[in-house]
Amino acid sequence: MKEFIKNTFQASNCRHLMLTGTRGAGKSTLLAGLFGENTPKITTWAVPEDGVYLRVNPLQRTWKVGLFDPDLPGPENRMVPLSFPVEAVHALANAPGEWAVVAEIGYLEFACPDYLQALWQLGKTKRLALAVRKEAADKIPMKDVFRVDLDDPAGNTGCVIMASGLGQRFGGNKLLAPFRGRPLVQQILDASAAFSHRVVVTRHQEIARLCRTQGIACVLHDLPHRSDTVRLGLEALNGVDRCMFCPADQPLLTGETLLALALLSQEGQHIWRPRCGAPGAPVVFPQWTFEALKSLPQGKGGGFVVESFPERVRYLDIHDPRQLQDADTPQLLRQLEE
């Protein structure tokens, strides 16, 4: 996960990094792995039935910033805020280097507006890496932040698996052809498992049955055009903020690539796609493209929208071209299996 976050953050070109998630999601541990011990850092920790303490490493000084209250209902959040030291933030500002780490922001910090205001000001002169409790994440006012929700990295990204092809070049329904002992389509079903908003669009009864046995939403249709598949997929995922259209015949496409595209597309302004030299699929479309996708010219796919807005396309560079390779013939499928 550490290398995945590092590489995806670098691809985003964002200034700041924010890891969020529920308690115990591993936010602070990941930040510690991403940034060495020498990076200027504010750390907080709780002592059971005592309080919460804050330490800033440039000063090697510790403050008590929270007090245990046994009368609170619990079992969590039984600390009440004391004063958070603005002096600790100033120490980060004066430390060398471009980065500063704040290893926890939650309900205690939000009870101390002067401390928070100092942090937001710090973001104007330092790049910040923040670990933020999920309930506080939407309150962060900073811009140009790459956000990773460790509980749900795909977030509100829809995933439409395009499984309607007739396999004419393959000589049959290639999505049911064996690949490493399982139907080819199973590869993309596994790779996209992290998407809570996901649907398979297919003309094939066998694929619909396979989806049903695994509890995966499926739209079975008999419409002839690629534009129909796009529209049906979007209509089935009403309410998503962006939507990935994923081919079902790229068996080496990884779940990490799908999640990286989902994370990068959170900024909501650009169309995102992978490339390894030449661009490929899948493609993530932001919400502002949805009406155009639903009204594509007959027979056209999402590429029609991509070509209409070339200045709005961004790329995730990957290093294995085989991830983007279609298994269009039995020979190609065997080569990808090797």
Q: Where are these predicted regions, by residue range?
A:
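N-terminal glycine-rich phosphate-binding loop and ensuing alpha1 helix
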Residues: 157-205
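N-terminal phosphate/diphosphate-binding loop that engages ATP/GTP or pyrophosphate donors
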Residues: 29-77
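Conserved N-terminal catalytic core of the sugar/cofactor nucleotidyltransferase
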Residues: 186-244, 256
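The conserved Walker
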Residues: 23
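Conserved beta-loop-beta/alpha segment of the NTase-like Rossmann-fold superfamily
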Residues: 225-291
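Conserved alpha/beta core of the MobA/IspD/sugar-nucleotide pyrophosphorylase nucleotidyltransferase superfamily
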Residues: 294-338
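Conserved glycine(s) of the Walker
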Residues: 26
